């Protein structure tokens, strides 16, 4: 089981040290190494028809670890002067996808790179046109 709270502590703008550490700690044990664009793909099943997507960069202005407060099952940033956002939209998606993979739910799981700076990871993936793309009926994005 993955700790959502621990994952939310990472402030990870694209190409930052915190993003690299996040990917190494949380993504690579399940997904293996990323493609040349920084995207992670994991497939469960034979020609799955659903794709689940999120991304591993956040809109934080700085790289590092943020302090969080958990009160009455609500998570918030401890100090808004040291962090400009929680980063919960994409991080919750990554957390959910890791748990779905652990449960063996069939699908193509994609965690894109560089989404907060122009959707570069998803655009590159579509341009590469991997074979599994033609088998999909739908993509469910866990980003908002």
PLM ranges: what are they?
Residues 41, 51-53, 110:
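Short, conserved beta-strand segments within well-ordered enzyme catalytic domains
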Residues 46-106, 126:
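Active-site metal-coordination/substrate-binding segment of hydrolases
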Residues 1-6:
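N-terminal, Lys/Arg- and Ser/Thr-rich interaction peptides
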């Amino acid at each position: 089981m993955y700790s959502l709270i621990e994952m939310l502590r990472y402030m990870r703008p694209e190409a930052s040290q915190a993003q690299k550490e996040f990917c190494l700690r949380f993504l690579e044990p399940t997904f293996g190494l990323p493609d040349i664009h920084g995207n992670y793909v994991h497939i469960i099943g034979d020609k799955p028809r659903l794709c689940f997507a999120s991304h591993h960069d956040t809109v934080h202005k700085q790289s590092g670890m943020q302090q969080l407060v958990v009160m009455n099952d609500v998570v918030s940033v401890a100090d808004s002067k040291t962090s400009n956002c929680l980063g919960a939209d994409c991080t919750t998606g990554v957390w959910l996808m890791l748990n779905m993979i652990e449960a063996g739910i069939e699908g193509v799981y994609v965690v894109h790179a560089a989404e907060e700076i122009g959707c570069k990871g998803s655009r590159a993936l579509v341009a590469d046109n991997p074979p599994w793309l033609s088998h999909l009926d739908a993509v469910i994005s866990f980003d908002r």
